[in-house]
């Protein structure tokens, strides 16, 4: 069993009004809270990981390839591996992102 207490996690300032907090992970799965100020952007990108984003709070325009939808609290999207995707925050909020396999590039080794 892996248990991660919130007080043991690190809030990372990504700049530009965005934050990231890795909540839990193993090699197969990663859970990440991503914060956005209103008007900030999650730049369009792709990766080999399958990703699901669940809206904890706020409103977002979420784009996968050439399709854009507006999502809010309780909504979720699934991004298949290798697909271009990004978001624009239209009301300050947080996403809960799940990646499989885990994003090793997010993990800071000390």
Outline where the language-model segments fall:
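Conserved short histidine dyad/triad with adjacent acidic residue
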Residues: 32-46
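Glycine- and acidic-residue-biased ligand/ion/polar-headgroup-sensing regions
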Residues: 49-60, 65
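Ligand-binding loop in jelly-roll beta-barrel domains
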Residues: 81-105
């Amino acid at each position: 069993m892996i248990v991660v207490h919130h007080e043991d996690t690190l809030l990372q300032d990504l700049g530009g009004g965005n934050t990231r907090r890795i909540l839990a992970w193993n090699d197969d799965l990663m859970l990440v809270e991503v914060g956005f100020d209103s008007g900030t952007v999650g730049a369009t990108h792709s990766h080999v990981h399958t990703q699901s984003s669940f809206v904890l709070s706020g409103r977002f325009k979420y784009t996968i390839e050439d399709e854009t939808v507006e999502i809010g609290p309780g909504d979720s999207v699934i991004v298949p591996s290798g697909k271009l995707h990004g978001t624009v925050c239209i009301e300050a909020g947080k996403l809960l992102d799940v990646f499989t396999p885990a994003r090793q590039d997010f993990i800071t080794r000390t």
